């Protein structure tokens, strides 16, 4: 199968086709992925995002990989919903170190009615700084997606995690169909989709292929596809899972690039365990987005200065961002404070 034929957008991939991509010689796969990548992106630019946990721990879901699940004793301290001012201060810091997108994550099964007004103000404030906005809040209903879109949310993250066949071995508190329904609501509301999965949970090659097929065969490809390598956390059921072979991880990125040629493929969780050579291979395979900063929700991430040093050595530049003066950042923070104090719909999230 030539690179030129896979550079077109398809939504009808079969398991046989995708497995054939996975098992071809490594150099052939990377050549094909890089060729597709260059047809749609500047191969020497990477989109940079920062992820902030706005509500940590005590999640009612039982995802076996997650240290935030209330089902497991991981030593993670529960934190309540962060206040708007603090979120906007963190967003300003993220932009100052080069992020173009600010992602906010809450450890919920779904956001409650009392939380939504607060979350919407976060979106509005971050958007006012000129940053792209992204949130991951769990399952959404149609009204919630429409409210987030109206507030200016650009991306909603809702990962499929793995294949439909393997999913029940990892999560029992939310169905695969519910995840797909949330993605449909997000798309119908006019927002962009961020959705991917995790390697290293005991899944098979078929499972990895079927995860990518689920994503690539959606009516529209996700604009962002995060590929995570399991971060093994003591206290979770997967703390002793086998390591992912580095070449298998690179193959996953390359096949994702070929199947979804116009999507940003994000090198996401697990990057702390990757050496510079593996990260360089990931970029060559078509990864063109990273999370930037010292922490990814609750697990370590390479330090920001190390990322910039690696970019410099590889000749990679962060994607361009919209510039706003410091006064705009401060005005957004101050406006959020005024609205929070004057509106009776807000509650003290620190209590």
Curated annotation (Swiss-Prot):
Q: Which reaction does it catalyse?
A: (4R,5S)-dethiobiotin + (sulfur carrier)-SH + 2 reduced [2Fe-2S]-[ferredoxin] + 2 S-adenosyl-L-methionine = (sulfur carrier)-H + biotin + 2 5'-deoxyadenosine + 2 L-methionine + 2 oxidized [2Fe-2S]-[ferredoxin]
| Name the record gives this protein | Biotin synthase
Entry-linked CDD domains: Radical_SAM
Q: In which pathway does it act?
A: Cofactor biosynthesis; biotin biosynthesis; biotin from 7,8-diaminononanoate: step 2/2
Q: According to the record, how does the cofactor bind?
A: Binds 1 [4Fe-4S] cluster. The cluster is coordinated with 3 cysteines and an exchangeable S-adenosyl-L-methionine. Binds 1 [2Fe-2S] cluster. The cluster is coordinated with 3 cysteines and 1 arginine.
Which keywords label this protein? 2Fe-2S, 4Fe-4S, Biotin biosynthesis, Iron, Iron-sulfur, Metal-binding, S-adenosyl-L-methionine, Transferase
Q: Record's Gene3D superfamilies?
A: Aldolase class I (3.20.20.70)
Q: List the disulfide bonds.
A: none
Which SMART domains does the protein's record reference? BATS, Elp3
Locate the residues binding [2Fe-2S] cluster: 103, 134, 194, 266
Per the entry, what this protein does is: Catalyzes the conversion of dethiobiotin (DTB) to biotin by the insertion of a sulfur atom into dethiobiotin via a radical-based mechanism.
Tell me the domain of life: Bacteria
Q: A GO BP term, please?
A: biotin biosynthetic process
Record's subunit section: Homodimer.
Show which residues constitute the signal peptide: none
Q: What SUPFAM superfamilies does this protein map onto?
A: Radical SAM enzymes
Q: Give me the residues that bind [4Fe-4S] cluster, please.
A: 59, 63, 66
User: What range(s) does the Radical SAM core domain occupy?
Assistant: 44-262
Q: Does the record's keyword annotation contain 4Fe-4S?
A: yes
Claim: Manganese is one of the keywords in the record:
no
Q: Which cofactor does it need?
A: [4Fe-4S] cluster; [2Fe-2S] cluster
- This protein's encoding gene: bioB
Its EC number(s): 2.8.1.6
Family, according to the entry, reads as follows:
Belongs to the radical SAM superfamily. Biotin synthase family.
Q: Which InterPro entries match?
A: Aldolase_TIM, BATS_dom, Biotin_synth/BioAB, Biotin_synthase, Elp3/MiaA/NifB-like_rSAM, rSAM
